[in-house]
Amino acid sequence: MNRVGIDVDHMIGVLLLAVVVVFWVGASCLTNELLETNAYNKPFFLTYLNISSFALYLTPDLWRIIQSRRKSLQERTERTLPIHTQESFSEFLPLLSSTPSTSSNLSSIADTKVKDTMRLSLLFCVLWFVANLAANAALSYTTVASSTILSSTSSFFTLFLATSLGIETFSTKKLLGLFVSLFGIILIVMQSSKQQDSVSASSFLVGNTLALLGSLGYSVYTTLLKYEISSKGLRLDIQMFLGYVGIFTFLLFWPILIILDITHMETFELPSNFHISFLVMLNCIIIFVSDYFWCKALILTSPLVVTVALTFTIPLAMFADFVWREAFFTPWYIIGVIFIFVSFFLVNHRGESAVEKDCAAVEKGPILDA
């Protein structure tokens, strides 16, 4: 693959990330509306529902299996039919002798692919769930803008993790970006707390802590997913991967849902009216689509680029808070956001050698299924 091809892949990844940013801010607004207003304050169930819905990605595979079984049954039926002439039998015999071998090889390859994907999905479903649960729960205590901004610190967690795994190079400029971002975050959190007279400072502390926990979890599964794909040369089938993440989430976390209901920490109940049901389903659809785009963008770009893209959720989240909550932002709040923007430019700076290294790596062969 030439450098032009690489640029095209990268551009496609960036465009997908742009869609993801819009979708994620929209999902944050919907979740915030459900949780903070107590219209449907069920962060665990919402997370469980959103991620379990990924199982629907296996529908095409299930349909192909059904069609394959039907075709196989039809072929076995046809083989039992009487053959009227020796000539027709001799023409058909080679097909019969070659079919089992070919089918066996294809089946072996397919089984290996499914097992690798299932292993990867099982490994990441817990990280995925915990990170999303923390991010959703944070919206019960803080604003969309604060949650989104704090979640964007995953870029810095990603930098350290990716550097330790050899996926990313470390530089003084990127380290400077970390400190600039930290200063901006402090300004933003302080101003967010001052704006909310009706909510205690401890609630904001809980919300901000959960947002940071979600940020750390996000950076861990993003970096490790890219590492697993790159280091082992896996050809990731995104639909199958997400599908099994949904299946494992559904199977592993339903006991916790029951425990939360029994202990009254989060009672299980369906939405009480159409409006809430609509918001819940819309949020689920947004996550369903956007996380597919996110996976594709991760493969086409890099963990750091994907996490840096969260920067652009900040102005959108601020606008969402302005529209939904009639929030106001002090000059210090805006300055904090500017600091974070500057820090991401520093962290995302790449030299020519890094670009050439990526070119060489991609030319070795694609890892993305068409």
Curated annotation (Swiss-Prot):
Q: Residue ranges of the EamA domain?
A: 129-190
> Quick one: where is this thing mainly located?
mitochondrion
Highest taxon of the lineage: Eukaryota
Side of membrane Mitochondrial intermembrane, spans: 32-42, 141-146, 191-203, 261-273, 325-326
Under what name is this protein listed? Thiamine-repressible mitochondrial transport protein THI74
Residue intervals annotated with topology Cytoplasmic: 1-10, 64-119, 168-169, 225-239, 295-303, 348-370
Source organism per entry reads Saccharomyces cerevisiae (strain ATCC 204508 / S288c) (Baker's yeast)
What function is annotated for this protein?
Answer: May be involved in thiaminediphosphate transport across the mitochondrial membrane.
Look up and give the membrane topology term: Multi-pass membrane protein
Sorted UniProt keywords: Membrane, Mitochondrion, Transmembrane, Transmembrane helix
Where in or outside the cell it occurs: the entry states:
Mitochondrion membrane
What does its record list under induction? Repressed by thiamine.
Residues passing through the membrane, by range:
11-31, 43-63, 120-140, 147-167, 170-190, 204-224, 240-260, 274-294, 304-324, 327-347
In its keyword annotation, does this UniProt entry include Secreted?
Answer: no
GO CC aspect terms = fungal-type vacuole; mitochondrial membrane; mitochondrion
